[in-house]
């Protein structure tokens, strides 16, 4: 998983090479499969299906690739929401359908497109932005099955990094972001701007750089869980750190602003809206904390403030409000 994450942060690769690199390294750790596929998607208009952008595959039958592309094109609005409107999740197709009271045999679109081609089930990691665009890693499975909790968590943690890397690449492509801080291992923060240079930010960024190094020092398979807990894709709900090397050989961590963007209820601060968004997806405080690179206590505090500002008494009200707003949207 660490090798996959490291290649995810390769900003020097163009789009074609980056997607191929993700597919190649995902194939090594894909459950019950010798290959993997990755693709970007746009599920913001469910009635039009799911639009696939860049994609790449490694060691997979061409029939699975073609079936996946066709499946997305023909996805129903209901399946678009089930699979692509859920944040960062990892599951098998059979498990997603089971949780929604159905099965592969009862889902005509999947049964014809994929199961009918000789792939009884498939694994998928989906990393979706609030705008319902994002990145998928998927692979066929030779039997209907569910993933164990440890494997599922490792993939979801990896998804946090791939999601952050993809979001940052898109922002850099639009020239929408610039570095705000630079940390040099052994020296600490050597540059900071836009609030990244104050004492609190300095401590957070230096700690994040040390954690990234400590995670990669735990490279063995038996230490993967510990390493993934240490290394965060987002720091303080704001920055993603990229390792770079200067021409003189100096190693640096460069921090880019990389928080997810979405429509903001005017009452909420940017930090409160992030927590409220993830809570509305049904994410637990501990998982929100991991995704945003903050503590569970900070999540609880920001969520309480957000609920108060929105006039809600419980996080379940936030989930209900989010669902009600989605159902009131035109199906466009």
Question: Could you say what each language-model-derived stretch is?
Answer:
Residues 13-17, 35, 40-43, 136-270, ...:
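Linker/hinge segments immediately adjacent to helix-turn-helix/homeobox DNA-binding domains
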Residues 115, 290, 308:
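Short polybasic/polar patches that bind polyanions
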Residues 307-332:
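Basic, Lys/Arg-enriched C-terminal extension of HTH/homeodomain DNA-binding domains
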Residues 1-154, 158-165:
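Regulatory input/activation interfaces that engage signals or partners
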Residues 298-299, 312:
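Short alpha-helical segments used as structural interaction elements across diverse proteins
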Residues 302-305:
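Residues within the DNA-recognition helix of helix-turn-helix
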């Amino acid at each position: 998983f660490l090798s996959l994450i490291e290649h995810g942060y390769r900003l020097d690769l163009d789009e074609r090479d980056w997607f191929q690199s993700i597919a190649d390294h995902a194939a090594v750790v894909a459950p019950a499969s010798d290959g993997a596929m990755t693709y970007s998607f746009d599920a913001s208009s469910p009635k039009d299906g799911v639009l696939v952008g860049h994609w790449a595959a490694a060691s997979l039958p061409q029939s699975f690739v073609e079936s996946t592309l066709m499946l997305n094109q023909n996805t129903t609005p209901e399946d678009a929401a089930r699979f692509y409107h859920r944040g960062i999740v990892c599951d098998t197709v059979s498990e997603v359908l089971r949780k929604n009271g159905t099965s592969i045999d009862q889902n005509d679109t999947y049964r014809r497109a994929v199961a009918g081609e000789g792939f009884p089930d498939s694994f998928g990691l989906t990393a979706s932005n609030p705008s319902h665009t994002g990145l998928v890693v998927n692979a066929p499975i030779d039997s209907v099955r569910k993933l164990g909790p440890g494997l599922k968590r490792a993939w979801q943690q990896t998804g946090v990094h791939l999601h952050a890397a993809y979001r940052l690449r898109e922002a850099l492509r639009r020239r929408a972001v610039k570095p705000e801080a630079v940390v040099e291992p052994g020296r600490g923060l050597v540059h900071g701007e836009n609030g990244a240079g104050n004492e609190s930010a300095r401590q957070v960024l230096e700690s994040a750089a040390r954690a990234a190094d400590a995670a990669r020092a735990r490279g063995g398979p038996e230490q993967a869980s510990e390493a993934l807990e240490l290394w965060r894709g987002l720091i303080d709900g704001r920055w993603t750190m990229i390792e770079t090397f200067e021409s003189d050989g100096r190693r640096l961590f460069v921090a880019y602003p990389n928080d997810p963007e979405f429509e903001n209820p005017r009452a909420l601060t940017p930090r409160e809206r992030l927590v409220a968004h993830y809570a509305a997806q049904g994410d637990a405080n501990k998982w929100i904390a991991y995704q945003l690179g903050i503590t569970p206590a900070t999540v609880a505090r920001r969520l309480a403030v957000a609920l108060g500002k929105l006039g809600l008494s419980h996080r379940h009200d936030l989930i209900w409000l989010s669902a009600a707003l989605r159902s009131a949207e035109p199906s466009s």
